[in-house]
């Protein structure tokens, strides 16, 4: 079976038990944040469902297990966004035709829908028709972002599971086994990534804590000098969205400090800077700053063909004119 992270074992066993008891649902929807390794959970569930032994875990010995291990099982299918964009209706129709046929291995059929929130309306409706009339021994495993919205009719046809971030102790111990850093650095990485262990591990491995600290120091210089053109060259072409996220986390923590909210702080290691910046802003000003940078982030992810530097410059200029100079 695909190796599972420790925080995924409980939900795996819960879902697996429903199949062991003959109560496995034909459409299982799992909503989860990125950075939790949920793909391995879906792989493990698919392997279990396809295994002819039908034990708590896939046996790893039957022909079906061997096909799954070789990624060549003819009755296992995947649906995912094309080029990271949408899942189109033609993709769903092709899958519908495949699952309508008899299983080539005379066992179960599984369809893994990765990024179900990316289904176009036509694709969602085409999938709905299949979910409304489930075929024997055919199972759909749907993955969606925790904040995503899907058609209510698709929800109603699925058994829905919500996967939350693991408790800090589990995440901390796992990270400690994977990295040779100080405990406080692990806690900082977890806070930066809202408790998501895989993103925290990447943060530790890539040195993002120090990079973020240096970048936010330059953001402070930009704030003092009101100089967008000084900060603009410091955005990395490979991770400008991540750098926008660092600014958003800083602004969000400033607003929380202003409102005396202590939970879910992402930049707790920069406490003095948070206090000073928030003391110089109004709550409404901080909220407006967050809205501006959220729009920048959204535009960077969704608008093609527009110069990235222009979008960043527009956002930074708006921070100056609509927030900093109005305080």
From Swiss-Prot:
Gene3D superfamilies membership: 1.20.272.10, P-loop containing nucleotide triphosphate hydrolases (3.40.50.300)
Domain of life: Bacteria
InterPro entries attached to this UniProt entry: DNA_pol3_clamp-load_cplx_C, DNA_pol_HolB, DNA_pol_III_delta_C, DNA_Rep/Repair_Clamp_Loader, P-loop_NTPase
Keyword Protease: no
A molecular function (GO) term: DNA binding
Enzyme class, UniProt record, top EC level: transferase
Enzyme Commission designation: 2.7.7.7
Catalytic activity: DNA(n) + a 2'-deoxyribonucleoside 5'-triphosphate = DNA(n+1) + diphosphate
Entry-linked Pfam families: DNA_pol3_delta2, DNApol3-delta_C
GO CC field: DNA polymerase III complex
Coiled-coil parts of chain: none
Summary of the function given for this chain in its UniProt record: DNA polymerase III is a complex, multichain enzyme responsible for most of the replicative synthesis in bacteria. This DNA polymerase also exhibits 3' to 5' exonuclease activity.
Name listed for the protein in its UniProt record: DNA polymerase III subunit delta'
Organism: Haemophilus influenzae (strain ATCC 51907 / DSM 11121 / KW20 / Rd)
């Amino acid at each position: 079976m695909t190796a599972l992270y420790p925080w995924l074992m409980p939900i795996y066993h819960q879902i697996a038990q429903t199949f062991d008891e003959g109560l496995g649902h034909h459409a299982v929807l799992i909503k989860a944040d990125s950075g939790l390794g949920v793909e391995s959970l879906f792989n493990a569930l698919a392997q279990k469902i396809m295994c002819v032994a039908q034990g708590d875990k896939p046996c790893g010995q039957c022909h079906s297990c061997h096909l799954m291990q070789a990624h060549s099982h003819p009755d296992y299918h995947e649906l995912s966004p094309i080029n990271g964009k949408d899942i189109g209706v033609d993709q769903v129709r092709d899958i519908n035709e495949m699952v309508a046929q008899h299983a080539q291995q005379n066992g179960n059929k599984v369809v893994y829908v990765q990024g179900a929130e990316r289904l176009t309306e036509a694709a969602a409706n085409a999938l709905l028709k299949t979910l409304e009339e489930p075929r024997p021994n055919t199972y759909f495993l749907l993955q969606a972002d925790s904040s995503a919205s899907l058609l209510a009719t698709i929800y109603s046809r699925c058994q829905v599971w919500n996967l939350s971030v693991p408790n800090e102790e589990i995440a901390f111990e796992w990270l400690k086994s994977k990295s040779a850093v100080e405990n406080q650095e692990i806690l900082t990485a977890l806070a930066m990534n809202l408790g998501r262990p895989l993103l925290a591990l990447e943060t530790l491995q890539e040195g993002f804590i120090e990079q973020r600290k240096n970048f936010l120091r330059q953001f402070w210089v930009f704030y003092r000098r009101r100089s967008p053109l000084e900060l603009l060259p410091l955005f990395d072409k490979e991770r400008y969205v991540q750098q926008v996220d660092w600014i958003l986390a800083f602004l969000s923590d400033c607003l929380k400090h202003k409102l005396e909210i202590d939970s879910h702080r992402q930049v707790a290691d920069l406490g003095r800077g948070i206090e000073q910046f928030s003391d110089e802003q109004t709550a409404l000003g901080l909220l407006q700053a967050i809205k501006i940078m959220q729009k920048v982030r959204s535009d960077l992810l969704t608008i093609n063909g527009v110069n990235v530097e222009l979008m960043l410059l527009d956002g930074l200029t708006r921070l100056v004119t609509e927030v900093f100079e109005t305080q």
